[in-house]
Amino acid sequence: MRRSMKKGFTLIELLIVVVIIGILAAVAIPKFANTKQRASRASGLADLRNLATAQEGYFADSSRYGVTVDTLTFLNFRSSNGNRNLTILAAPGGWNATIVVPGPQTCGIFVGLAPGRPGGMPATNNDGVPVCW
């Protein structure tokens, strides 16, 4: 007697596996697609917090706030990533800091509490519209 020794997967089984992999990819890829953007944003927020600490240290030493990032280097303030542009703008009774991140970003506003800005007022443009990051 002769037996048929065919081994392997049928076309239907292979198609089912491909569909399952496609469904998993459709769920997983959007979940992790903006991971780099979120990490960059978290690093930028940490830079802003460190900048606020450095500004308060500078104020305690010289009775005024620093007007450039370079004035804070003696306090060992360094931006965590060279891909951002961090600037300080002197304001009446305080200062404003801006971080510009290259590339497309979804809208978000970070407001920190600082002296001279009670309640954490958001930064605004010339039209009074909150600046988005």
Give names to the regions the model predicted.
Residues T10, G44, A52-T53:
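Hydrophobic transmembrane-helix microenvironments that flank and shape a buried ionizable site
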